[in-house]
């Protein structure tokens, strides 16, 4: 089984595979500069679109952590109230699950991992890391590996730049990192140990945003890409 991936802006990604849908860090209404919230047209589909919309009633909601550029409690509550979700995965969870959803919140040690067979032939592996940055060192982050017999994709979230923590992911076909991770000293080792065919940079400001922060993240991403083999990013 192969994957179809769709951006929901910023760090949000809709992951579809063999009829199973996962939404990672993808439900945000509140702005958090310089990163865009979920686009209004997608948020409308999520909350009030037809039942046949691919954004409605996803099977699993995944959250790398609960910072406001990844998680919007009010918008997530609204989504759970109007959709049938099987399970939520996160390092922690701030409220009782609603509707059909089961909240599966657990912290993992750095480099620790747990596997879940979320559908026949599809494994979700949560990998524990600290959040990057000294000021956030106490914040737990889940990196997520989604794997089938044909493809393996690793999303690092905002995990710190310690390659050995991600070893449980093994070799991957695609690696999703934010601009700061891409430009970190850890990135060449990540490429060596995971051997991705493609590195995707997500958690970027909107292209039309040209303020100082947005320009900083774009410069960092461009600088990091130049350090890796041509065509990988």
List each language-model region with its residue ranges.
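Active-site neighborhood of phospho(di)ester-bond hydrolases with catalytic His/Asp-centered motifs
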Residues: 23-25, 57-69, 89-92, 154-158, ...
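Active-site HxH/HxHxD metal-binding segment of metal-dependent hydrolases
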Residues: 49-115
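Active-site-proximal loop/helix segments of hydrolase catalytic cores
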Residues: 74, 130-193
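Active-site beta-strand termini and strand-to-loop segments that position acidic
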Residues: 15-18, 118, 146-149
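Binuclear metal-ion centers of metallo-dependent hydrolases, dominated by the metallo-beta-lactamase
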Residues: 100-122, 166, 188-233
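Pre-active-site segment of Zn-dependent metallo-hydrolases
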Residues: 17-62, 74-78, 160-170
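Active-site-proximal beta-strand elements of phosphoester/diester hydrolases
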Residues: 4-7, 22-25, 123-129, 152-158, ...
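Active-site environment of divalent metal-dependent phosphoester hydrolases
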Residues: 11, 29-31, 66-71, 93-98, ...
